[in-house]
Amino acid sequence: MMATALTLRSMNRSDRDLYLFDTFEGMTRPQDVDIHASGQAAMTEFVEEQRGEDSSAVCYASLDEVKSAMARTGYDPARVHFIRGKVEETIPSQAPESIALLRLDTDWYESTRHELEHLYPRLSPGGILIIDDYGDWQGARKATDEFLANHAPGLFLSRIDDTGRLAVKP
C-alpha cells in the first residue's frame, strides 16, 4: 500500500481513500488446503512460528509499525483507513462501496475466497485486481479459480511474477 500512496503522491493525487485490512498480529491459522508451491503445508510453518491460538509471527507487523510506515509516504493520513481484524470478520461491513484497485494478500484459501466474494463485486469496471499469492499458495489459487469460474468466467489473469496475478475487471 505504500507503493500506491507514493504513486498517487507522484501524480499529485490525494483524493483516494486507502483501506488496509489486516490482523496486525501475523498470519491467521491456515487450513489443510493451504500448501506452499514447494509442497510444504502452511500449518507446519504456522505452528513453528505460533504467537497465539490463532496467529503466527509469520508476516507480523504491528498496527503502529504499519501506521508509521504509511506516514513516511506523506500521503494524507485522513485518507488512510486501518481496519484491524480477520477479513472474514471485517469484510464486508467495513469495506468501501466502490474499489478501483483491489490487492489481495492474505495467502490462505478461506480469506481469499471471502475477499473475492465480497470485494470483487465492488471493484469498478476497469478496476485492477491483484492476487498476490496465486503462484505461491495452493489455497489462494484454488479460491481464485473457483470464484472466477463461477462469477467471472473468461477473466484473464496476467502473470506479474512467480506469485502475483493481475486482471482488469471488464
Language model feature labels by segment:
Residues 1-170:
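S-adenosylmethionine/decaboxylated-SAM
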